[in-house]
Amino acid sequence: MEAARPSGSWNGALCRLLLLTLAILIFASDACKNVTLHVPSKLDAEKLVGRVNLKECFTAANLIHSSDPDFQILEDGSVYTTNTILLSSEKRSFTILLSNTENQEKKKIFVFLEHQTKVLKKRHTKEKVLRRAKRRWAPIPCSMLENSLGPFPLFLQQVQSDTAQNYTIYYSIRGPGVDQEPRNLFYVERDTGNLYCTRPVDREQYESFEIIAFATTPDGYTPELPLPLIIKIEDENDNYPIFTEETYTFTIFENCRVGTTVGQVCATDKDEPDTMHTRLKYSIIGQVPPSPTLFSMHPTTGVITTTSSQLDRELIDKYQLKIKVQDMDGQYFGLQTTSTCIINIDDVNDHLPTFTRTSYVTSVEENTVDVEILRVTVEDKDLVNTANWRANYTILKGNENGNFKIVTDAKTNEGVLCVVKPLNYEEKQQMILQIGVVNEAPFSREASPRSAMSTATVTVNVEDQDEGPECNPPIQTVRMKENAEVGTTSNGYKAYDPETRSSSGIRYKKLTDPTGWVTIDENTGSIKVFRSLDREAETIKNGIYNITVLASDQGGRTCTGTLGIILQDVNDNSPFIPKKTVIICKPTMSSAEIVAVDPDEPIHGPPFDFSLESSTSEVQRMWRLKAINDTAARLSYQNDPPFGSYVVPITVRDRLGMSSVTSLDVTLCDCITENDCTHRVDPRIGGGGVQLGKWAILAILLGIALLFCILFTLVCGASGTSKQPKVIPDDLAQQNLIVSNTEAPGDDKVYSANGFTTQTVGASAQGVCGTVGSGIKNGGQETIEMVKGGHQTSESCRGAGHHHTLDSCRGGHTEVDNCRYTYSEWHSFTQPRLGEKVYLCNQDENHKHAQDYVLTYNYEGRGSVAGSVGCCSERQEEDGLEFLDNLEPKFRTLAEACMKR
């Protein structure tokens, strides 16, 4: 029993040891290492306390919880306060509970918060020797995710300087996001150097921030250089890719080959380039109509191509595609956008036009022209009103004579068959045409390897028509000898009836006959010579004389034709020398060439025979002729004749002996060329005649004309010195003063004794219209006496210094510009008595005239009949002058002024 007790005690101790070890293992397995965080005495709400490494303790935790409600734990281990906390000198702790809900595993982390009063360290004074130590003050990589959800302020990193071991360091920052826009985005804790962000940031607006961190002591000393700190904003896939257009429109030709490019679409993404966020993939997600699938899209470039060659515009002319672009390289979680793409199918000429009928029948009357006889239609499935649809017709067979043409109606696309050249029923009653049609645009070889032209047959029946005479051929000829006797007849123009092919019943009429040489028989069309025919006449061209003939039938239908009369030549013209003046330069030239012509035909012309007229021996002695060819000979002098002009008669005969004599004026001249000939007289010939050149004659004529001009000018100037006033007609003194200063010849008249002094001014001169006038001067007044037809009259013209009543009284010269003279028997009767009236006035004291002096009166206006007024008054006298006693009021004052008071 006693031995057993120690054994039992040992067993109990062993069990207690095992239980203690198990408890320690269990506790060790549930708890992780403790974490101590140094914090200030006061913690504001939602302030970052620190960060705990949760992964180190429990990597599979999916539930995080804090034992103290004043603290909140995030997934990354960040510890934030939920309320404002004041710490005492004692420690404060809480537990972070980590658990996995799947396997019910749990872990704990004990967190201790300690408040440690920071002792300000004094900066070393100069008396203390400083030892040089290596410092670390370099940029620390820093980044933050754009559009972060917080919680804010979001801790970014801690900025620390190694000098904090020796000094009390205060941290501060400046730059964009701090004191520059966007302001107050970042801040740093002065004591700890912790850098925080206060709100979310959009990378598309700010890709990064470069701020400057400063480390200073409380007294302002800066132991470190400013630290450039770059904060990069990490991109988040928060932007959708966007197509550059809402709707894309492309056009492609039908029947195109597989792989033909239709077009290219493009999209943009504002996220960070060269990342998965901007790696785009394109695709087609829908097509209208849905079948068949004819298009594909390259996923990277966005190029749309065809997958089939069966695009047919006549079936479907437009396709609509729904396209998509997605970022993240097209993965299912990428952002995507859709757009619309419209593809229009353009037409090509893949359908040939075909006639709706293969044969047509039509008819037309003969002799009709420029008429439409048939319209043909075609079918074409290509696009209307395009070159692929418009038809182009042509006549393939049956139009060898060019009677028809076919054109296209631009509005209906029909073929219009027309007659452009008249048809003849008597020649052909039916014509068969083959017509074909193609398009304006060439046929597409991609649609069909071969193309065939559509053809149709057109039968044209020619209908008979009662025609007029036919002038066929339109130009006919007859032959007649020139100089044929008047009345000679010949066959004329013949027209035919196309129905009977005969000329019976046709009447003929001459329309044109330039010289009236022939007449035409009305019934037969034969011609008769009316005047002698001359083949060499100017109206004849190439020996043919043309007349125009009109042929008509009984129905009045007509045709016209031309009859050419070929005139057969007879030898009726002698050869002659057209150039009748010859210059031979002596001694450089010893001869001259002379040429003869003959208007007749060559059969009656050359060779010509040239000879000197043998009537005078002097010609034979001085000249000789030598034939050069059939139409020319050489004339040369002999025996050294003197310079001068000679007449040399030459006889020219044609081959039939008809001849003529031409007298040549031959000049022997001392010259080198003919143009230099001055016609000098040979010194051996004395007293030769002198001849004037054309320029000398012209100079003499001009000199004579100049002398005549000078003489004419002198004559005109002499006649102009005599003052000849214009003649003003005396209109029978109707309410005007009668001209009373007439000095007519005759001894049996009583002259005025009023003391007028007269002086002859100039001799009489011939007037323009044949009136002779003579001028006298009366004091300061000029008087012109005009004599015509035995009657006499006179008018006065005031001199210089007074108003002129006549336009001709200028500068002392007068001109007669009017040929009208109003003279009558009344003047012949009254003029001799005017002198008596003046004489009686002087005898009467009560009616004595004023002293003789020139009276000046104001001009009453242009055109006044009484242009000048004399100084004499008259009283009543017999012989019809009683009207002077009863003057009208406007003349009384004038009469009183002329009387002596």
Curated annotation (Swiss-Prot):
Its main location: membrane. The chain crosses the membrane at residues 695-715. Induction: Induced in the hours following cyclic mechanical strain in keratinocytes. The modification Phosphoserine is found at residues 864, 868, 873. One of its GO terms (cellular component) is cytoplasmic vesicle. Residues 716-901 are cytoplasmic. Changing residue 179 to G: In ARVD11; uncertain significance. Glycans are attached at residues 34, 166, 392, 546, 629. Residues 136-243, 244-355, 356-471, 472-579, 580-694 form the Cadherin domain. Residues 28-135 form a propeptide. Residues 136-694 are extracellular. It is a single-pass type I membrane protein. InterPro entries: Cadherin-domain_protein, Cadherin-like_dom, Cadherin-like_sf, Cadherin_CS, Cadherin_pro_dom, Cadherin_Y-type_LIR, Catenin-bd_sf, Desmosomal_cadherin. It comes from the Eukaryota. It is found in: Cell membrane; Cell junction, Desmosome. Residues 1-27 form the signal peptide. GO terms for molecular function: calcium ion binding; cell adhesive protein binding involved in bundle of His cell-Purkinje myocyte communication. Changing residue 203 to C: In ARVD11; fails to undergo complete processing into a mature form; fails to localize at the desmosomes. It is linked to Arrhythmogenic right ventricular dysplasia, familial, 11: A congenital heart disease characterized by infiltration of adipose and fibrous tissue into the right ventricle and loss of myocardial cells, resulting in ventricular and supraventricular arrhythmias. Expression is decreased in the intestinal mucosa of ulcerative colitis patients, potential adversely effecting wound healing of the intestinal mucosa. Calcium may be bound by the cadherin-like repeats. Three calcium ions are usually bound at the interface of each cadherin domain and rigidify the connections, imparting a strong curvature to the full-length ectodomain. This is Desmocollin-2. It comes from Homo sapiens.
